[in-house]
Design a protein with these regions (language model features):
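Structured catalytic-domain cores with a bias toward divalent-metal coordination
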Residues: 2-18, 36-368
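Bacterial N-terminal signal peptides
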Residues: 20-31
Length: 368
């Protein structure tokens, strides 16, 4: 498509793997000692890098009740000691912009400019990517951001998430989980700030969300707190004492340059916040804070017709869209239960009973 990045295949990815001053004092006080310092090599799977090096490889998940999996991974190590930052994308293999953004970071991060270590996973759900299946891993039908911390003896999804938990989450200091609109989701960019109730930890992750620069931030105060049933990647990191952020950009199977740039530049800004790169971060100054989100689902099967676009502000009771039967008769109307902003809306006509029509957010009256 004109104006878009060309989308690399999984084989291409495998080959190519081969704000400001106020935040610095805050992070220095709270982050504690980095997970990695000194001249030793750092390895994740077959990717092993020493100071000033970049390495690519795979994190192999052995076969069990179903097929094994090789997860593409890269390690980029700076020339100076510092924290470990993990960047994970592709839990949903058709969220293409986020996959391409992390792959671009693998190519462009310069170890000579860096302090610390970056672990990069551009594509967790390779089967979803290759088969163009949204939302789930087609090998076992499971959502790869709903089964953390995984199981060593589970299905492919569970075994993969167990490996990510052990080999990446437990070895990093900071983590960013990359997502976006799936094939059927027309999404506006936004991020999730995990509000855990730990004031010191929440202050750091709030600064990370601001530094990333997306202008809409969802306050996620309801993430699981049990490390043994953490469900999401960001919650898995948080329940293990890490500083985690989730970001969303990209929509409906596209790889728009502005979405890729937002994810790449946001990552570089966070790295500056963490003193992993020189320079100052570029935080968003006046974000829209979302205090709660709601998923609106269809009560009927048929043809979906949206009436609002991503990012639209709608009043309580306003019609967001409707579903017709295959003869054109309206069988369901979707309305906003509160005044809200549309975070994403279904991008395709296909609709089954129980499918998501839209996810909307209620804007906070004042910043947290």
């Amino acid at each position: 498509m004109s104006g878009m990045y060309s989308l690399p295949t999984i084989h291409t990815i495998g080959r190519r793997l081969i704000l400001r001053a106020f935040a610095a004092g805050l992070l220095a006080a709270l982050a504690g000692p980095p997970a990695v310092a000194g001249p030793e090599t750092f390895a994740v799977g077959t990717a092993s890098a020493g100071p000033g090096q970049r390495a690519t490889g795979v994190l192999s998940v052995p076969a069990g009740s179903d097929a094994g999996l090789d997860i593409p991974v890269a390690v980029v190590r700076g020339t100076r000691s510092g924290p470990v930052l993990a960047l994970v994308a592709g839990a949903h293999g058709t969220e293409y912009a986020s996959i391409v953004a992390v792959e671009k970071l693998i190519e462009t991060l310069d170890p000579a400019e860096m302090s610390g270590t970056v672990i990069l996973v551009p594509l967790l759900n390779t089967a979803s990517f290759e088969q163009k299946v949204p939302h789930v891993n087609p090998i076992d039908g499971k959502n790869m951001n709903r089964f953390y911390p995984g199981k060593a003896d589970g299905t492919q999804t569970e075994r993969a998430l167990f490996a990510v938990t052990k080999q990446i989450v437990e070895r990093c200091d900071y983590l960013v989980d990359f997502h976006g609109g799936d094939l059927d989701e027309d999404l506006r960019p936004y991020s999730y700030w995990l509000k855990t109730g730990n004031e010191k930890r929440d202050a750091v992750t709030r600064q990370m969300a601001l530094a990333f620069g997306l202008d809409t931030i969802v306050i996620a105060a309801d993430r699981p707190t049990d490390p043994g049933a953490s469900r999401y990647l960001d919650a898995t990191a948080a329940t293990r004492g890490k500083f985690a952020l989730t970001v969303e950009a990209g929509r409906a199977g596209t790889v728009a340059p502005e979405d890729v740039s937002a994810l790449v530049n946001g990552t570089l800004s966070v790295m500056r916040l963490l003193k992993m790169l020189p320079g100052a971060p570029s935080p968003v100054e006046h974000p829209v804070w979302i205090e709660s989100i709601e998923t609106i689902t269809s009560e009927q099967t048929g043809i979906f017709r949206p009436l609002v676009a991503r990012g639209a502000y709608v009043a309580e009771g306003m019609k967001i869209g409707y579903v017709t039967d295959y003869g054109g008769r309206t069988v369901f109307e979707a309305r906003a239960q509160k005044a809200c902003v549309v975070l994403y809306v279904c991008a395709v006509p296909s609709m089954k009973k129980g499918d998501t029509i839209a996810t909307v957010g209620v804007v906070a009256v004042s910043p947290p």
